[in-house]
């Protein structure tokens, strides 16, 4: 049989082959344009079926965002020492393969065990407004001087929740993750 062609088969086998043709898209950000798949059956004796078109519509799936290189970090803290960044390796990376920004998303930092809600604080280090820097002004969080979100909580046992906007790119949120602080 020629490339892309099956050898002659009985009718029942041909039906089974047709029922098992599958379509898939490789990659995380496929085009959502419709595709047309054309099926033609020949009998090996010169007979050819009519063209049978099927339209395939690809519906994108929202892949989850990721934070890598943060798990396993360990922070040795002396009581009363002031705010210290939690991300000790300075190599955490935030990514989202199918979104250019985290508009309306949130970044939440919370204690999962052993917290003293009367004394433990989660916050955001204010580096400034320069290139690559995270800043804090009131409840606003900035990256390179542009607002990327607002925050609430972080004290009295409340989670630190940063609500992000369209300016919160993966690069900006990576910088933010690297500037979450702990203080007692």
Model-identified regions with their sequence ranges:
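Extracellular glycosylation-rich, acidic/polar low-complexity regions of adhesion-
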Residues: 1-184
């Amino acid at each position: 049989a020629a490339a892309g062609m099956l050898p002659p088969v009985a009718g029942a086998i041909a039906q089974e082959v047709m029922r098992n043709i599958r379509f898939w898209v490789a990659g995380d950000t496929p085009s959502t344009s419709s595709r047309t798949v054309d099926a033609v059956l020949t009998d090996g004796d010169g007979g050819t079926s009519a063209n049978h078109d099927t339209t395939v519509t690809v519906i994108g799936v929202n892949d989850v965002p990721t934070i890598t290189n943060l798990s396993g970090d360990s922070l040795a803290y002396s009581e009363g020492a002031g705010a210290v960044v939690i991300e000790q390796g300075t190599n955490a990376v935030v990514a989202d393969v199918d979104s250019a920004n985290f508009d309306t998303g949130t970044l939440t930092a919370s204690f999962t065990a052993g917290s003293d809600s009367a004394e433990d604080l989660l916050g955001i280090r204010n580096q400034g407004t320069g290139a690559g820097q995270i800043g804090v002004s009131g409840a606003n969080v900035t990256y390179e001087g542009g607002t990327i979100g607002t925050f609430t909580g972080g004290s009295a046992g409340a989670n630190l929740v940063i609500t992000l906007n369209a300016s919160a790119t993966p690069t900006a949120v990576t910088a933010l993750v690297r500037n979450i602080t702990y203080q007692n």
